[in-house]
Amino acid sequence: MFSPKIIILSTGSELTSGRSQDTNSSWIANELFGIGFTVSKLVVLPDDPEAILEELRTLVSLATKKNPVLLIMTGGLGPTEDDYTLEVVCKLKGVSSVESVVARQRIEAFYKLRGKNFQESLQTAIRQISVPKDSTILNNEVGIAPGFIVSLGENVHLGCMPGVPGEMTEMFREEFSTWILKKYSTRELHSGFRFIWWMSESQFQKEFISKEESVTSGKVIWGVAAKRGYIRVSFQSNERALVDFLLKKLDEIYGPKSTLDVFEELPKLLIEKKITVGTAESCTGGLISKIFTDKPGSSTYFYGGVISYDNGVKEGILGVKKNTLKEFGAVSMETAKEMAEGALVALGVDYSISVTGIAGPGGGTPQKKVGLVYFGIGQKNEKTETHEHYFPFPRSSFREFAAHTGIYLLYNRLKRLA
């Protein structure tokens, strides 16, 4: 079997109207890249059954024996009248729909748990628990609606998943990716990635990519995605040694600024070393705490946070000295240091992250411009580290840059002490 031409389709009028962003397609494309597949095309369609049907027919016609097509579609599997995916796929295949036994059991349990009568809502529920006849079912372990895979000809398959990101990601990782790997043989591909902190895509391409013969010659497929505070660099090749060489070179050139996925690795470190953490946040307004608590099991290491937006909270709860605030200001290295040390005491933790800055658009001065931010990394019975950064971006972007940087700074300190 040849490697397929993969096309991702996202459905939803909220996407085509601009009311919501399509994050599913980029997530799926990244996951596929990690298992050795590349995406040829991304398509966004409204909740219009005729438009969806026409697009699918066009894409099906592209398939040949040497160029099989895999279509991956998200959205349109819900209970409402504008969820058309099941209807369209059944029409395209000329088959009826059947209930998924597993999905019916899940929805009955769902209604029972909430004291609702399943029979009274049967017609609505049926839309969510049905799949095309003779399809491969992708079970939904997070929500209700199952996904499914159907053959649309000898050389083309269509996989459909819910549009809800949490349901889709679990379904793809647990079931769909396994099916793809079994169905399509690929050359053995090796991949790896790094986060490079405080680096732009263009700067990285100029400094690194343009000078690497293995990349410019096409021996290695590379990709870079800009995030708030870092870029994610990935390499893929059928030669493991080439990927390892490039990753090692990144680590040598960029040192501690070259990391694995900090947001995955930091929780592992905290759990492994049985370390507890707390936060003292001003300009980020609790965003660092959110990043910690987004991870399942974070209660084992994250004790809590203080949102010290007002100076009175900095003084009253964190113990920042009045003279410090008066002499140096709320946005200062000195205040960040005392915030971090106060969080250690107030929360009874081993480590703390503090952040204070000017998110804008107002509040800046010639001496302290909008975008200036200070961090403190506190450690019980040890000297507190302080860091200064400057993120001259819109308010929401500034907050994300600052929050991500705070997580990185704690990770970096723990790695240095390991």
Curated annotation (Swiss-Prot):
InterPro entries hit by this protein: CinA, CinA-like_C, CinA_C, Competence-induced_CinA, MoaB/Mog-like_dom_sf, MoaB/Mog_dom
Organism superkingdom: Bacteria
Gene3D superfamilies from the UniProt entry: CinA-like, MoaB/Mog-like domain
Family matches, as NCBIfam families: PncC_domain
Family to which the UniProt record says this protein belongs: Belongs to the CinA family.
The protein's name in its UniProt record: CinA-like protein
